[in-house]
Structures are given as C-alpha cells and as structure tokens.
C-alpha cells in the first residue's frame, strides 16, 4: 500500500472502513475514470496519453484473460 500516494491510501482506508461507498465493478470504474481523463481537453496531452495508454492496456488484459 505504501507505493501509492497519500490520497489513494486515505480513500482506501475510508472505503475499507465503510465511510465511503465501495464500487463492486472496480474495473469498470477505473476504465470510466481513465477514459474521462483521456477525453479531457483541459488536461495536458501527456496526462491524457498516460490515461489512454493505461485504459487500453486494461482493455487488452481483460480481453486476453477471458
């Protein structure tokens, strides 16, 4: 858990404690979030590219593993 930033660790603790809602479709949540980042023209292109690359890799790994 230490490899993740403070914000991720804090939200993890809140979800684990029940203070924040848990989303059962975590892969769908991640893909929707990465897609939103990749589509956001207000963000730097490098950030958008990273999000798109991560989303595409998730889609490939999910498809290949089925």
Swiss-Prot record:
Domain of life of the organism encoding this protein: Bacteria
Signal peptide: none
Disulfide bonds: none
Family designation: Belongs to the UPF0253 family.
Stored NCBIfam families: PRK04964.1
Listed name of the protein: UPF0253 protein PC1_0961
Organism ancestry: Bacteria, Pseudomonadati, Pseudomonadota, Gammaproteobacteria, Enterobacterales
């Amino acid at each position: 858990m230490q490899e993740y930033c403070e914000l991720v660790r804090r939200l993890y603790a809140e979800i684990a404690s029940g203070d924040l809602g848990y989303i059962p479709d975590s892969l769908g949540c991640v893909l929707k979030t990465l897609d939103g980042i990749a589509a956001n023209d207000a963000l730097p292109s490098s950030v958008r590219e990273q999000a798109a690359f991560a989303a595409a890799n998730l889609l490939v790994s999910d498809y290949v593993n089925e």
